[in-house]
Amino acid sequence: MGTRVTQFSYLHAPSSHMAEQLLNQFISAVISKSRHLNHLKQVQSFMIVSGLSHSHFLCFKLLRFCTLRLCNLSYARFIFDRFSFPNTHLYAAVLTAYSSSLPLHASSAFSFFRLMVNRSVPRPNHFIYPLVLKSTPYLSSAFSTPLVHTHLFKSGFHLYVVVQTALLHSYASSVSHITLARQLFDEMSERNVVSWTAMLSGYARSGDISNAVALFEDMPERDVPSWNAILAACTQNGLFLEAVSLFRRMINEPSIRPNEVTVVCVLSACAQTGTLQLAKGIHAFAYRRDLSSDVFVSNSLVDLYGKCGNLEEASSVFKMASKKSLTAWNSMINCFALHGRSEEAIAVFEEMMKLNINDIKPDHITFIGLLNACTHGGLVSKGRGYFDLMTNRFGIEPRIEHYGCLIDLLGRAGRFDEALEVMSTMKMKADEAIWGSLLNACKIHGHLDLAEVAVKNLVALNPNNGGYVAMMANLYGEMGNWEEARRARKMIKHQNAYKPPGWSRIEIDNEVHQFYSLDKSHPETEEIYMILDSLISF
């Protein structure tokens, strides 16, 4: 009887270097063709039976496939823990997986690094340190980064540029370590655009916008991420006009090509300043660069047009979006609510529930929009219903913003007993916004006694804001109690309180002009007032 020979007969041939190489190639190919975890387990079993479970090369392949394709970190760790003498590449494979799943696996990454240090063989190198330094900003201990810093200094790897940059990024990611980050930055033997951007982002994160801008201006070269970092810094710190100005500079740089992050940052600034014409130009720019289809850009456009009052354009962008995220739905609901179109806001929510009930669930922002819509529309019953829906059906714990909306809704409707009852059930203390909305409601309905209680609490929360006492003085005047009105006015003077000045913006030729009440610092004040007087005289 003849012997049956298969295409895999060489797998059971006598051991040789060539046979082992062929076997390694075969198993490597099988790993790359695997589709799920059971396949991988079969391959691992075959490696054990074939005496190849000690192969660093194949174990590395298993780990990479398990983490990158299957995203199964627990089984990857299972594979690693059964390897007798792991090398640096295997440690790096697991650390890469942990550092790619931050902040979820930050503590696992740091513990794994400490395991490697305690074993002493192999020692961490310039590949390992940057990986563990990614995790340290997410740890609760403020000493994690300095601990790694001390260890890498002793090992001599602190001189590697890639390690220095990772260390800088780790320090700069923590507000408490920003001084150490700057010290390290100044001592770096070689600074590249990545290290400059890391330091810039650190200043932005700590709110030190002046140092962030100064550093940006000193940069010898700038790339798109560094431009995006300074744009985000300005936007996040309320310098919206400066962000718009920087964007204009950016698009005039011949070697710089703005991306989706750029557009999102500048659209956010435009939304806050109300620069609709400039925003339309940015929308056209994004369309020409094929960026408008990006889900984050699309969401930003909906938010922008909604805040600027162009709800038709916001609806158009929303409807054209190929994939509508929860952020887009929330933006649309909040846009309609902001402009008093309550029924349309509610209709968007009902559509979201009907089309996406299994894919997208509303969050706390959704219900803030709905409650605001009910407030502007005076829909008390619906507002109460949505508040109950949020807690009972979707299990969302009410935040102070939700309570504020509901109390505002009840107060505007003159249902003060119900508003006070809601306040008594809150797990947190009422803030300035809640007492302020209650004071406004008292002014509408002439509820003097409760207004006095509201002002007392508002003054305790913010003694420097004289606007609340001024409102109370006006309410006393409207009620004919001039003595109390005079007393309230004197209180403002004695407490050195101030009333925040009103302001407005106007956009002319893509340039924003901002005016404050009684402010005459504008260089063209005389001409502006002359035109204003001529308009009033008509």
UniProtKB/Swiss-Prot annotation:
One of its GO terms (biological process) is RNA modification. The keyword Repeat applies. Pfam families: E_motif, PPR, PPR_2. PPR repeats lie at residues 87-123, 125-159, 160-191, 192-226, 227-253, 259-293, 294-324, 325-359, 363-398, 399-433. InterPro entries: E_motif, Pentatricopeptide_rpt, PPR_At4g14850-like_plant, TPR-like_helical_dom_sf. PANTHER family: PENTATRICOPEPTIDE REPEAT (PPR) SUPERFAMILY PROTEIN, PENTATRICOPEPTIDE REPEAT-CONTAINING PROTEIN. GO terms for molecular function: RNA binding. Residues 434-509 are annotated as: Type E motif. The keyword Ubl conjugation does not apply. Belongs to the PPR family. PCMP-E subfamily. The lineage of its organism: Eukaryota, Viridiplantae, Streptophyta, Embryophyta, Tracheophyta. This is Pentatricopeptide repeat-containing protein At1g33350. Keywords: Repeat. Transmembrane segments: none annotated.
